[in-house]
Amino acid sequence: MASLKSIIRQGKQRRSDLTAIRNSGKVPAVMYGYGQKNVSVKVDEVEFIKVIREVGRNGVIDLGVGSKTIKVMVADYQFDPLKNQITHIDFLAINMSEERTVEVPVHLVGEAVGAKEGGVVDQPLFNLEVTATPENIPEYLEVEISGLEIGDSLSVADLNTTGDFTIENEPEATVVTVVPPTQGPSEAEIEEVEAGDADTPEPEVVGEKEEDEE
């Protein structure tokens, strides 16, 4: 579990105030949720990124708010790709004994046998819905694919996961599959098309015949 300090924002904030906060390297944020009133705060952007890299997108953070330390998760955040800047964060105060359902990323491990034979690994599901208490939410789910041949697939029911959590997706939902390689036209088909093009008469240029007759 990681810690992050915040500074309470006082009064009503105008757009120019929020811009000034961002230009100073801070991110405007709001904290709300279990047993807490809505509080407007700001946090250091660099420190926030460090914390997320440490605990993951669904990790629990000890957020310092005034004289209190509150356990929170990141409910949402906005990012401006043009400025490469986090523009706002929603912190959700949580009850550590209460289960939550969140999206957890799927990480494929290994190289499929079928991929070595020319097949293509297709991953329909990049995230899975997981229900658990905050401390039991995994940062990601690893799926071993080394033994998959062309035509093989793994569904949610096939996953070998450990931990005190429940995957909410349908058991038959496909997580990953190895599909046959896409085949281009054969040499015979290419030759047939080229022969057809050669037999096609060139279009007559309008006015050419009349000029010859003159």
From Swiss-Prot:
One family name in Pfam for this protein: Ribosomal_TL5_C
GO cellular component: cytosolic large ribosomal subunit
Biological process (GO), any one: translation
Recorded GO MF terms: 5S rRNA binding; structural constituent of ribosome
Composition skew (Acidic residues), residue ranges: 188-202
Assigned keywords, A-Z: Ribonucleoprotein, Ribosomal protein, RNA-binding, rRNA-binding
Chain segments carrying region Disordered: 179-214
PANTHER family tied to this protein: RIBOSOMAL PROTEIN L25/GLN-TRNA SYNTHETASE, ANTI-CODON-BINDING DOMAIN-CONTAINING PROTEIN, RIBOSOMAL PROTEIN L25_GLN-TRNA SYNTHETASE, ANTI-CODON-BINDING DOMAIN-CONTAINING PROTEIN
Function: This is one of the proteins that binds to the 5S RNA in the ribosome where it forms part of the central protuberance.
Quaternary structure (record): Part of the 50S ribosomal subunit; part of the 5S rRNA/L5/L18/L25 subcomplex. Contacts the 5S rRNA. Binds to the 5S rRNA independently of L5 and L18.
HAMAP family assigned to the protein according to its UniProt record, in alphabetical order: Ribosomal_bL25_CTC (MF_01334)
Protein family according to the UniProt entry: Belongs to the bacterial ribosomal protein bL25 family. CTC subfamily.
Name of the protein this chain belongs to: Large ribosomal subunit protein bL25
Lineage start: Bacteria, Bacillati, Bacillota, Bacilli, Bacillales
